[in-house]
């Protein structure tokens, strides 16, 4: 299974990629929102791990773009971000984000959430 990690922090991308690669997933990485949309459309990931605050397009703009595209509309999304106000969480969930996790985060918790979402999405 393929997972796209979109975060402008290379440190966070490396940490998440290391955990998910150790779990056996193929990992794609994007450093900004526009690249995330492009890779989601071309790379066809099974799940996205997405930051909210990124250059070019923020995480909510990415979610909107992906949900409007039939090729990516049903891809599960985990929002992994420092933006955890009630307004941010409700905004993300309202756009169709399946999970909203705060930073700092537990890589093991992220791994379990990813596994659970992928199991639910499997045919």
PLM region descriptions:
Residues 43-49:
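Active-site beta3 strand of CheY-like receiver
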Residues 54:
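Receiver (REC) domain active-site loop signature in two-component systems and cognate sites
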Residues 105-115:
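C-terminal output helix
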């Amino acid at each position: 299974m393929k997972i796209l990690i979109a975060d402008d922090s290379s440190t966070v991308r490396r940490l998440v990629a290391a955990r998910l690669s150790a779990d056996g997933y193929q990992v794609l990485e994007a450093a900004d929102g526009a690249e995330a949309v492009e890779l989601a459309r071309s790379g066809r990931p099974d799940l996205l791990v997405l930051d909210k605050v990124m250059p070019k397009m923020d995480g909510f703009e990415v979610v909107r773009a992906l949900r409007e595209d039939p090729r990516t509309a049903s891809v599960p999304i985990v929002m992994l971000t420092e933006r955890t106000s009630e307004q941010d969480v409700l905004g993300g969930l309202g756009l169709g984000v399946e999970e909203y996790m705060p930073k700092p985060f537990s890589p093991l918790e992220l791994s379990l959430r990813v596994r659970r979402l992928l199991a639910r999405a499997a045919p």
